[in-house]
């Protein structure tokens, strides 16, 4: 049951800081996205809504089995860091599908990739990256980019 006076917030994360989940489940479901730095990044975005009760947050994550039944939210927090990379098609397809289903405000920060300073090769999933960015442009007023290369998208 959610608190009706506070916003309902969807968060792209494998787990919330207030959850008690076993290490084995965290690792077997890759709820940290490959490294614990992802948790620091995603959890820091929760501070924007520190006055919202925990029951108003819903998590969605590519490695979680549960599927959303209700797509009615006030905000979708989308903390991404290294989204632009090879072999990330599954996550991009998941996020594109989700973005098409929601109508709430999207708060995106830190999108990009780990690019070298000299030269840049095109990714094989360039079309998915562009589709993802085009959807984001429709859903948010600003996109926080990680670097100059990401800004080119």
Q: Could you tell me what each predicted segment is?
A:
Residues 2-142, 148-153:
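Aromatic- and Gly/Pro-rich donor/ligand-binding loops
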